[in-house]
UniProtKB/Swiss-Prot annotation:
Protein name as annotated: Rap1 GTPase-activating protein 1
Low complexity bias (residue ranges): 567-579, 616-630
Annotated compartments: Golgi apparatus membrane
Species, as recorded: Homo sapiens (Human)
Phylogenetic placement of the source organism: Eukaryota, Metazoa, Chordata, Craniata, Vertebrata
Gene from which this protein is expressed: RAP1GAP
PROSITE patterns per UniProt: GOLOCO, RAPGAP
Length: 663
């Protein structure tokens, strides 16, 4: 019983095996070329490979009567070149006209470049939209009357591509942006082409036989003259198509044609170098095998099979077979074959596909060849290469537009290099400047500490050194030991803030507080902050100096007011500065900067203007200038506190005798 139940359960779990893999013999729907040649003619111009993979156009070549060429009398209307339909839209509708360009970055679509233009077609208002992505270019014309409200740029982009998912687009402000954009749009348009020309004689069914032919029949020579003009390769100035025009290593002559301002160079198999003993004739195959489209000329009725030539590039063939005509010239039968992933391309072949020699047929044939190459670009192998190339070019365009737009607004440029550690030495150069400034400030500190009892009156009410040597030491101009600017970056990627690395040079000095001598009524040093004339001039403009007449009175009044405050402040001095770097200003001043008042009349004496400034450099988006404080910071005596650095600004003038004032 158990075995029976288990058996039924196993039957339920059984599944049918997949069919066995088919061998190549199971996929042979077409006869081989040798089988076809064993039959009676006439034979078709093209035979499909045994395993398929190609399509054929133009299989009817029965000549019941001489074909008329009326359908080809107007090649400008019936025969036209097929290229990327969006490649010339920008040049036609946007370039030189009022329009707007934007750029953005989408997480899925990648880099986006968007162009829009207000257009009036007839009596109706329209929006012409052109969106470039890494895969393709979207174009549409939207009537404004169909919109409930006028859309913003993001909504406009979604009108042409619903997959757009960005918060905003950024305007392009570069005056030469149109040149960059039109160059990108038209990179898919080529004015130079190279096609292979293979001569197939009767009974030739392999690659080796095709490339080993050296003789040219009169019909083939006539066809080459019809196809283009014979040119000497030595010192040839036109498009050479990879042929050697200097040393003659790829033959002495070839066939060249200029068709509708497009240069075409033909790689003719019989004119390329022939190598004795080389069955594959690599000198010939390396040119024709690297072409994308080739013409196969048949003298007589021998079918051509597309897989005769092993090549990863050849995707389409135009087979032409000469047919004896009459006094009006020869007739040509034409068939076209291409790989399955190559889309159909025009102009379509007539039925029957037979042409009489003439300018109309030349127009048709050259147009067919050019359109064949454009169509081959859409094949899977070339489409991947094209997508990678397009993505790289679009990224380059995006970066160019962004950099130039930022530069037009005074942003980016050298600032981006400095914050990324490149340009101007980066971090290491800044660090060396900081260390250099630190040593200078410490030297000044040592000199000031050596002579603590020699003081004189300063403009702010403190006492300045009367010794000339000390005055020189104190005359070191605005020592900037380190710099920590905070910049507000306004760009498409949000507020990227980057602060250059600076080191606060704070020297801790411990000194015993001693009472001043009996004759000295004030401490060693006193500091007070003075209200500047404007907010932004606290560290830039020189303070107003009193005249010599009332100098003593002013100093006496301020010294009395600072008496209590000076006792609580530290006698040690530290040199530090906070310098704010505004947007768009290149270069960093980390050296010594002096503010001299020697040019002011009646100011002959040397003064030291000492002030306490509160470090108000904001790391927020504002980044306002450091502002002065009316009263000293509560923790001013703590020299090791980096949040409240002491800023000592020294103004030096000509070194002359300084009057001593007593309180």
């Amino acid at each position: 019983m158990i075995e029976k139940m288990q058996g039924s359960r196993m039957d339920e779990q059984r599944c049918s095996f997949p069919p066995p893999l088919k061998t190549e013999e199971d996929y042979i729907p077409y006869p081989s070329v040798h089988e076809v040649l064993g039959r009676e003619g006439p034979f078709p111009l093209i035979l499909l490979p045994q395993f398929g993979g190609y399509w054929i156009e133009g299989t009817n070549h029965e000549i019941t009567s001489i074909p008329e060429t009326e359908p080809l009398q107007s090649p400008t209307t019936k025969v036209k070149l097929e290229c990327n339909p969006t490649a010339r839209i920008y040049r036609k509708h946007f370039l030189g006209k009022e329009h707007f360009n934007y750029y953005s970055l989408d997480a899925a679509l990648g880099h986006l470049v968007f162009s829009l233009k207000y257009d009036v077609i007839g009596d109706q208002e329209h929006l012409r939209l052109l969106l470039r992505t890494k895969c393709r270019t979207y174009h549409d014309v939207i009537p404004i009357s169909c919109l409930t409200e006028f859309p913003n740029v993001v909504q406009m982009a979604k009108l042409v591509c619903e997959d757009v998912n960005v918060d905003r687009f950024y305007p392009v402000l570069y005056p030469k942006a149109s040149r960059l954009i039109v160059t990108f749009d038209e990179h898919v348009i080529s004015n130079n082409f190279k096609f292979g020309v293979i001569y197939q004689k009767l009974g030739q069914t392999s690659e080796e036989e095709l490339f080993s032919t050296n003789e040219e029949s009169p019909a083939f020579v006539e066809f080459l003259e019809f196809l283009g003009q014979k040119v000497k390769l030595q010192d040839f100035k036109g498009f050479r198509g990879g042929l050697d025009v200097t040393h003659g290593q790829t033959g002495t002559e070839s066939v060249y044609c200029n068709f509708r301002n497009k240069e075409i160079m033909f790689h003719v198999s019989t004119k390329l170098p022939y190598t004795e003993g080389d069955a594959q004739q690599l000198q010939r195959k390396r040119h024709i095998g690297n072409d994308i489209v080739a013409v196969v000329f048949q003298d007589e009725n021998t079918p051509f099979v597309p897989d005769m030539i092993a090549s990863n590039f050849l995707h389409a063939y135009v087979v032409v077979q000469a047919e004896g005509g009459g006094p009006d010239g020869p007739l040509y039968k034409v068939s076209v074959t291409a790989r399955d992933d190559v889309p159909f391309f025009g102009p379509p072949l007539p039925d029957p596909a037979v042409f009489r020699k003439g300018p109309e047929f030349q127009e048709f044939l050259l147009t067919k060849l050019i359109n064949a190459e454009y169509a081959c670009y859409k094949a899977e192998k070339f489409a991947k290469l094209e997508e990678r190339t397009r993505a790289a070019l679009l990224e380059t365009l995006y970066e160019e537009l962004h950099i130039h737009s930022q530069s037009m607004m005074g942003l980016g440029g050298d600032e981006d290099k400095m914050e990324n550690g490149s340009g101007g030495g980066g971090f290491f150069e800044s660090f060396k400047r900081v260390i250099r400034s630190r040593s200078q400030s410490m030297d000044a500190m040592g000199l000031s500490n050596k002579k603590p009892n020699t003081v004189s009156t300063s403009h702010s009410g403190s006492f300045a050194p009367n010794n000339p040597d000390l005055a020189k030491a104190a005359g070191i101009s605005l020592i900037v030991p380190g710099k920590s600017p905070t910049r507000k970056k306004s760009g498409p990627f949000g507020s990227r803030r980057s602060s250059a690395i600076g080191i606060e040079n704070i020297q801790e000095v411990q000194e015993k507080r001693e009472s001043p001598p009996a004759g000295q009524k004030t401490p060693d040093s006193g500091h007070v902050s003075q209200e500047p004339k404007s907010e932004n001039s606290s560290t830039q403009s020189s303070p107003e100096m009193p005249t010599t007449k009332n100098r003593a009175e002013t100093a006496a009044q301020r010294a009395e007011a600072l008496k209590d405050f000076s006792r609580s402040s530290s006698s040690a001095s530290s040199f530090a500065s906070v310098v704010e770097e505004t947007e768009g200003v290149d270069g960093e001043d980390t050296g010594l900067e002096s503010v001299s008042s020697s040019g002011t009349p009646h100011k002959r004496d040397s003064f030291i203007y000492s002030t306490w400034l509160e470090d108000s450099v904001s790391t927020t988006s504002g980044g306002s200038s450091p502002g002065p404080s009316r009263s000293p910071h509560p923790d001013a005596g703590k020299l090791g506190d980096p949040a409240c650095p002491e800023i000592k600004i020294q103004l030096e003038a000509s070194e002359q005798h300084m009057p001593q004032l007593g309180c």
